[in-house]
């Protein structure tokens, strides 16, 4: 097989979205390299997508960009690829973390999926006083992250961190990173913005001068943060309290809304 594969229609060459399957594989990628497929990826290509030997796929590993590849062999026992040309150089996503209090399983999965699609670099479950469910099925969430990245043209996977108590997170917080605290109304809605008890600014306004500074978004549990947690958060210099509008949002909706606002204000949607 020649090192170059003629793969028309790839984004970045003709500007047209390719219809070739796209896979994340945890292996080095270079022209002519052999790339083994996991059992799950082989099943997906051969049995779901109905691809066979000689067919073209796109692959990425989060380090070496995106490459075209051909299915070199396919059988019931598995499949393997031969890597061709690089179709896109490696690009990162903005330095944005999403931190959220775990909710019910399907909602947590939705948050993780949408955070991947919307370009979060780090996803971290945070256990608060009112967190209703702190069970995290990391293997299942990693599979969701992989599939979402494959479908949305990401060139990397966000880091999924293990869950940690909010108190520990705040104690070890990096000084250079802003924490965008989604606190809908504050304790006193008539008080001036900011301080220990005032309401937060609308998120887009609060982020207007943030620029490219590293940031994290904190989404609370369905029951909200406790008074002690909110007081602690508002006492920290690196915390920016914000509101997401006049309506009370579900946790998963708040995460999607906050990520969208941040990307359009400070991220790679600009």
Roles of regions detected by a PLM:
Residues 227-270:
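Structured adenosyl-cofactor binding patch, chiefly the S-adenosyl-L-methionine
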Residues 1-89:
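N-terminal positively charged helical leader segments and presequences
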Residues 131-133, 188, 248-251:
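Short gly/pro/ser/thr-enriched loop/turn and capping motifs at secondary-structure boundaries
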Residues 22, 34, 56, 78-80, ...:
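Structural motif
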Residues 179-232, 236-243:
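Active-site/ligand-binding-proximal alpha/beta "capping" segment
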Residues 86-185:
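RNA substrate-binding interface of SAM-dependent RNA methyltransferases
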